[in-house]
Amino acid sequence: MQQPILQVFHKKLKMNKLSSSAVRIEGKKFIPGIAWFFLVLVLICLPGQELPTVNDWLGKIYFDKWIHVGLFTILAFLFMLPLLKSKLPITEKWSYVIKIAIATSIWGLTTEIIQKFFVPGRSFDIFDWSADSLGALIALLFSKIRFLKK
């Protein structure tokens, strides 16, 4: 007798869950990402008067935005890398990479809110958040191209 489709689907789902839950990623592999997270937090909490002044030409090329892109690209990628190197199924890796990119963008928004309300001489800048989100997107695209080719 044939099994109902939902029962077969449920069994497949259960098998996938079992196989992926058997994959463990050591917490210590996330230490670089955690350290970078706190470095970014310290940097965004610097009062405005303690920041170096930007030369005229650096301002013209939006140097501060490129700093944001770099900081958040590295942040997202450091959290993605342990998952990308794991033995998780590729669909799960991709799911986690997307979630990390979204979380990184949300963290960028959160840092702007922290600056506006808690850091003297700093303010909320939508373009900083855009640069942070671009950094997360770059990490996501790099991960997709380099690690998730299938």
Located regions from the model:
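Bulky hydrophobic segments
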Residues: 2-121, 126-129, 133-150
